[in-house]
Each structure stands twice: as C-alpha cells, then as structure tokens.
C-alpha cells in the first residue's frame, strides 16, 4: 500500500480498516510505504502522521513486524528514515520471521525488505460418533 504524504493519513487508515473488517483479521499481511515516522518502528523521530498511525495500530490490535536495523527502509539525497512498514494481525504474528532490511542495491530509494512466512495450518478436530 502507498500512503501519499500529501493526503491525510486518516484516509489511508480507513482503507486498512476496510481490509481488516472484510478479512475478519484472518491472515492479513500488509506491506506499506506509510510516509509516517515513529520511534515505535525504529525511526529516529516521531511525526504527527506516525502518532496517528500508532494510535490506530494499538486500538485495532495490528502488529508492526519491523525490527531495529543499521539499515533504513528509505533513503534519498535528503536523508534516511523508516517509513515502510510490514503489518500483520494476531493470527499471523508468529508465522512471519526473519524480518530484515536488505543492504542489496536496487533502483528505488526504498530498501528491499525480506521476511520468511511459515504456513498457518488450521487444525480441525472432528467428533468421532463411535466414541458416544
């Protein structure tokens, strides 16, 4: 997802809320250029967009997978920041591991973000009618 820094972040939050509502929080993984900064996702500072997003994520029980790194998710001639987020719901929280910002060169001013996903297997227990 892309959150345009020229638009109100609340509009983007509404989009995420719709995704969460329609998915019923099952198996959602969102990779987003949020154009929002927060120390919660290991940026050097928190801006107003970041504060709004922090409150939303806390209230909706969605989780940020970003971890501390010597690399940043965004860099250009003006500086560096961590504005790209990987977000998930409680169901997938333990299934996504090895989150890392790659130091591999690419043509974008955004870094490559890598992670591993372990499949979630639903266990179905059927009642055996012979045990009654």
What are these regions (language model features)?
Residues 1-132:
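A shared catalytic/ligand-binding motif for oxyanion handling
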């Amino acid at each position: 997802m892309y959150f345009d820094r020229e638009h109100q972040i609340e509009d983007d939050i509404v989009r995420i809320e719709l995704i969460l509502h329609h998915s019923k929080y099952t198996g959602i993984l969102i990779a987003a250029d949020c154009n929002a900064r927060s120390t919660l996702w290991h940026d050097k500072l928190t801006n107003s967009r970041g504060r709004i997003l922090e409150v939303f994520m806390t209230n909706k029980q969605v989780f940020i997978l970003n971890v501390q790194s010597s690399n940043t998710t965004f860099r250009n001639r003006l500086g560096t920041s961590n504005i790209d987020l990987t977000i998930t719901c409680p169901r997938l929280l333990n299934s996504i591991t090895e989150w890392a910002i790659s130091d591999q060169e690419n043509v974008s001013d955004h870094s490559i973000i890598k992670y591993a996903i372990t499949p979630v297997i639903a266990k179905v227990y059927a009642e055996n009618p012979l045990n009654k």
